[in-house]
C-alpha cells in the first residue's frame, strides 16, 4: 500500500524544514538554539509516551522508577552547573515557570514592579501576558535611556513607595544586565521578593560570563532551557534554598503542569553535561561573537543600539532599521535571503508599534554552536549590508548564505564522536546511540 497523500505531505514538510533551517539558513533568532546529536538521540525515547504527575519518588502514577532517576539526575546536574541548591524542571516553558512563581507570590489585585518594557521586559511580565492573566497589577520601574536599563535611584524610590509583592528583572531584548545587587536590599526591605527571569541569559550565567542573580540577591530564578542554554524546549526554576522555591515547587502541580513532557529530561541532562565541560568556552565565544557582529554592523553604516556601552554584553544585538523601512519590512527581506532574525521593539518605540517596530533583534548563540567565530560575524554583517543597504538581489545573497552554511553544519561544544562514548556508556545507552 502506498502512503496516503496526507502522510506524504507531512513527511515532505518536515524534511523541507530540516533541510532549510538546519543546512541553508543563518539562524539568528535570539530565543532559539540547536541541541547536539547526542541530546537529540535521547530526546526521542519511551519517556515521550509516559506520565509522571508530582515529584520524583512521590508520584500519582506507577511505572515511574526510571523517570524518578532521570529527573533527579537532571536536576542535580542543573544545580551543579548553576551553582544553586534547588531546581525544578517541571515547567514546560519559561512563561509557565514565571506563571508558577508569580501566582505564589501575589493575589489578584496585588502589585508587582517590572523592568521597563524599554529595557526589555518579556510579555509574560506585563498586563498583556501572564501578570495580566493572573490579575496582578504591573507597574514599570523608571527607565534610564542613557544606559538602556532600569534607573536605579528612581526604582529604589518607587519600591519604597509602592511596596510591591515582588519585583521582576530580566528580559527578552536583553543587552545589558539589570541591577540585581543594587535593588535586592531595597526589595527585601519592604518585604517583597526579587524574581529574575534568566530565560535568555541562562547559558551565559552557567558559562560564567554573566553574573549569577541568585548570588546577587534574587530569591528565585526562572529560565528557558533552549536559548543560550542549548537544550530541549522547556523551562526551569532555581533558588539557593529560599522558602519561595518550596512554595512554588508544591504548587507547580496541579496548578500549572500535570504531565511535564518527560522526554525533555534525558536531553536536558545531556545538555547539562555538555555545558559542564564546554559551557564556559561556548559562552565566551557567544559574547565575543555578539560584540564582533555589533561592531561590524556599525562599521557598515547600521545604527546599532548601545554604542556608548559597547553595544552588548549578551548574545543579542539590536539594530534600528527605521531608515530602511522598519523592522517588519527588513525582517521579511532578510528571510528572503535565508537570514532569519525577528523584528523587535526598541527602547524608544511605543508598545502599540509591536507589529512594525523600529528594530531587529539578532542572536548569535545558534550559529556560535555551529562553530562560527568573529570572522564569520564580519561575513554576516556584510551579508546584511548587501541585502539592506546595497539592495543586492536577495536570491544571489541567498546563494552566498547557503554556501557559507556548508562549512557550518556540525554542532560544536559537545563530545566529538558519539561512537567514542560507547566505552563510557551503559548497554542501554549503546542501544540508543
Curated annotation (Swiss-Prot):
Chief site of localization: cytoplasm
Cofactor(s) this protein requires: pyridoxal 5'-phosphate
PTM-bearing positions, type N6-(pyridoxal phosphate)lysine: 227
Pfam families: SHMT
GO molecular function: glycine hydroxymethyltransferase activity; pyridoxal phosphate binding
Keywords from the UniProt entry: Amino-acid biosynthesis, Cytoplasm, One-carbon metabolism, Pyridoxal phosphate, Transferase
EC numbers, comma separated: 2.1.2.-
Binding residues for (6S)-5,6,7,8-tetrahydrofolate: 121-123, 243
Pathway membership, UniProt: Amino-acid biosynthesis; glycine biosynthesis; glycine from L-serine: step 1/1
InterPro entries tied to this protein: PyrdxlP-dep_Trfase, PyrdxlP-dep_Trfase_major, PyrdxlP-dep_Trfase_small, Ser_HO-MeTrfase, Ser_HO-MeTrfase-like, Ser_HO-MeTrfase_PLP_BS, SHMT-like_dom
Example of a GO cellular component annotation carried by this entry: cytoplasm
Compartment list: Cytoplasm
GO biological process, one term: tetrahydrofolate interconversion
Site (Plays an important role in substrate specificity): 226
Subunit architecture: Homodimer.
Role according to the record: Catalyzes the reversible interconversion of serine and glycine with a modified folate serving as the one-carbon carrier. Also exhibits a pteridine-independent aldolase activity toward beta-hydroxyamino acids, producing glycine and aldehydes, via a retro-aldol mechanism.
UniProt xrefs under HAMAP family: SHMT (MF_00051)
Family named by the database record: Belongs to the SHMT family.
Protein name: Serine hydroxymethyltransferase
Record organism: Saccharolobus islandicus (strain M.16.4 / Kamchatka #3) (Sulfolobus islandicus)
